[in-house]
């Protein structure tokens, strides 16, 4: 295993020093694949294009992120930015590598969440686009473009994570494989407009299930805060260690998203617009308004205390699907005052 990790450091060093002109590209790619962006950007963008597809992306995102958290607790996995120092590798072998603000994530490293969660959540989008393209062209070369773009993007995400010292190559590979498999398995099984109790129980299961596993492992003598301690110890700058990269930050986001989706689908606002077909201009207006509300939510910041942050994060992501699914479309439809035919199944 030591040789595998050493090879990962050498690969990161090569990416940083042999291809310096690509630094901004890698930073941009890893930003695009940030799991938080699946919730805040990809979800509304896809939802306003296709309600069914948007809900699929959202559901798969928070289920896969929860599974990624559980996998990391059991698989552990060092991250390169701390392993290179903690193992003594940097003292024995001169190495020219440096960290970035997005390097210092606090959770265990295996498997890569960026690769796993993004790969799974974008799977139904890729399949839908592939089906649309296949229905409009007979060219086999054109038909493979969506799948090729999907694979190319995930490959770039994996390389960016190695470049940033956030993951070793084998962790990236594990994340890619898990993401594709979960996307394939979960896409046909996304629940659509179930009763509110179903979503409430889902949120409760995510929260209590992860908490039970955490305390069970803690009782058995496993210190699951080990990765937080190492990240804080070896990160070049303390301000790069962000609270929203902690494992329980993703748990509060996932459980809040599950509950929020259920509430959104059972609000009076959604009941009024669920069979309304929005025009392209209205969809664009919905997305712009949703992004404006997101900017406001981000402007609010978060409490400095860890426990209060988790509560705030839960409430924030409970509110977010209510805004995207119910309130924003209702506001746009009401203000535009346009009659629309019943929505087609999408």
From Swiss-Prot:
InterPro entries membership: Glucose-6-phosphatase, P_Acid_Pase_2/haloperoxi_sf, P_Acid_Pase_2/haloperoxidase
Any one biological process term the GO annotation gives: glucose-6-phosphate transport
Keyword Hydrolase attached: yes
Pfam family, any one: PAP2
Residue ranges, Lumenal side: 1-25, 78-115, 163-167, 219-254, 305-307
Membrane topology (UniProt): Multi-pass membrane protein
Key word Endoplasmic reticulum present: yes
Compartments it resides in: Endoplasmic reticulum membrane
TM stretches of this protein: 26-46, 57-77, 116-135, 141-162, 168-186, 198-218, 255-273, 284-304, 308-328
Catalysed reaction, written as an equation: D-glucose 6-phosphate + H2O = D-glucose + phosphate
Binding-site residues, substrate: 79, 161
Regulation (activators, inhibitors): Inhibited by vanadate.
Tissue expr: Expressed in liver and kidney. It is the major glucose-6-phosphatase expressed in the small intestine.
Sequence ranges on the Cytoplasmic membrane side: 47-56, 136-140, 187-197, 274-283, 329-346
Pathway membership, UniProt: Carbohydrate biosynthesis; gluconeogenesis
This enzyme's EC code(s): 3.1.3.9
Main location: endoplasmic reticulum
GO molecular function, one term: glucose-6-phosphatase activity
Enzyme class: hydrolase
Keywords: Endoplasmic reticulum, Gluconeogenesis, Hydrolase, Membrane, Transmembrane, Transmembrane helix
Catalytic center residues: 114, 167
Induction notes from the record: Up-regulated upon fasting.
Annotated function: Hydrolyzes glucose-6-phosphate to glucose in the endoplasmic reticulum. May form with the glucose-6-phosphate transporter (SLC37A4/G6PT) a ubiquitously expressed complex responsible for glucose production through glycogenolysis and gluconeogenesis. Probably required for normal neutrophil function.
Family to which the UniProt record says this protein belongs: Belongs to the glucose-6-phosphatase family.
Protein name stated in the entry: Glucose-6-phosphatase 3
Native organism: Rattus norvegicus (Rat)
